[in-house]
Amino acid sequence: MALNIENIIAEIKEATILELNDLVKAIEEEFGVTAAAPVAAAAAGGEAAAAKDSFDVELTAAGDKKVGVIKVVREITGEGLKEAKAIVDNAPSVIKEGASEAEANEIKEKLEAAGASVTLK
């Protein structure tokens, strides 16, 4: 028996809301799916699109271990000692702009391990 999609669509068009509701329930039970799954996936996709994909890493304070923080800033930025010291001395300063979430978190961990206070924006 071949499926005739046009006939199926015609039958669906003629069905009442109650009949369509029963059809959906029967399909859900037969195939182990839910009609709510596509709606939830669409909502999750909307949230993912709204999530930030780039972060600015801001050094808010150097803390007590300023020399260690300067070393980490030099490593991250590639700047010389004088420039890295100026960045640390002038905190709050943006260390890295447009970093991915993983990169931003890695930089934050390094700076915090050196004793700095860091925020991601």
From Swiss-Prot:
One of its GO terms (cellular component) is cytosolic large ribosomal subunit. InterPro entries: Ribosomal_bL12, Ribosomal_bL12_C, Ribosomal_bL12_C/ClpS-like, Ribosomal_bL12_oligo, Ribosomal_bL12_oligo_N_sf. Belongs to the bacterial ribosomal protein bL12 family. Homodimer. Part of the ribosomal stalk of the 50S ribosomal subunit. Forms a multimeric L10(L12)X complex, where L10 forms an elongated spine to which 2 to 4 L12 dimers bind in a sequential fashion. Binds GTP-bound translation factors. Disulfide bonds: none annotated. One of its GO terms (biological process) is translation. Keywords: Ribonucleoprotein, Ribosomal protein. Forms part of the ribosomal stalk which helps the ribosome interact with GTP-bound translation factors. Is thus essential for accurate translation. CDD domains: Ribosomal_L7_L12 (cd00387). PANTHER family: 39S RIBOSOMAL PROTEIN L12, LARGE RIBOSOMAL SUBUNIT PROTEIN BL12M. The keyword Ribonucleoprotein applies. GO terms for molecular function: mRNA binding; structural constituent of ribosome. It comes from the Bacteria. This is Large ribosomal subunit protein bL12. It comes from Streptococcus agalactiae serotype V (strain ATCC BAA-611 / 2603 V/R). HAMAP family: Ribosomal_bL12. It holds the Pfam family Ribosomal_L12_N.
